[in-house]
Amino acid sequence: MRRAVVLLSGGLDSTTCLSVALAEGYEVYPLSFDYGQRNRKELESAKQVVKYFKLKEHKIVKIGNVGGSALTDMNIDVPDYKGLPTIPVTYVPARNIIFLSYAVGYAEVVDAEAIFIGVNAVDYSGYPDCRPEFIEAFQKAINLGTKSGVNGKPVKIITPLINLSKAEIIKLACENNAPLHLTTTCYRGGEKACGVCDSCVLRLKGFKEAGIVDTIEYMERT
């Protein structure tokens, strides 16, 4: 059976991505990171998603507090959604570079041919490491800088959600019976989702456009 490493944050997109890998017949190796994120519920959600799909392997890597972001520094406020065309304070420095680098090494160790990552360039917060050109550049680095790449069988980065709207992602998740009720999206990380940060607003908008009810609890529904 083909093997794939799946980057799993515990959020809607990564959980959908995991469901796609399973639907495509991969033996999946979920990979999560503890990087000092404000929303500590993310990792618990990731564990619940893994349990829901009855997966045996789930690697959680503790890399310490990356810092420099509202998602990792309690002294930086998470802003309400504004939809501005700028890189927001919730950007975590080089996050996907770090995650993908580790994922490539892990993929070579477990002999996986692919890495699934739920980056999206449509309904997203403007992070530079979610763009198609970043993924293309990183794929070139894999091709040139790994044993599998030099041997002509590089680990392939697969981004099934990159050109989908949030509504399309939600519909895909439902088709694959992904447990969206277990996912955590809010940047603020409270007991209930705030409903007004970038991530919450995009999620609520997606569910509304998909015509599907979002069953997680919110402080406020926009």
UniProtKB/Swiss-Prot annotation:
Its cofactor is Zn(2+). ATP binds at L8, S9, G10, G11, L12, D13, S14, T15, T16, C17, L18. It catalyses: 7-carboxy-7-deazaguanine + NH4(+) + ATP = 7-cyano-7-deazaguanine + ADP + phosphate + H2O + H(+). One of its GO terms (molecular function) is zinc ion binding. Keywords: ATP-binding, Ligase, Metal-binding, Nucleotide-binding, Queuosine biosynthesis, Zinc. Zn(2+) binds at C186, C194, C197, C200. Pathway: Purine metabolism; 7-cyano-7-deazaguanine biosynthesis. Its EC number is 6.3.4.20. One of its GO terms (biological process) is queuosine biosynthetic process. Binds 1 zinc ion per subunit. CDD domains: QueC-like. Belongs to the QueC family. NCBIfam families: 7-cyano-7-deazaguanine synthase QueC. PANTHER family: 7-CYANO-7-DEAZAGUANINE SYNTHASE. Homodimer. Catalyzes the ATP-dependent conversion of 7-carboxy-7-deazaguanine (CDG) to 7-cyano-7-deazaguanine (preQ(0)). This is 7-cyano-7-deazaguanine synthase. The gene is queC.
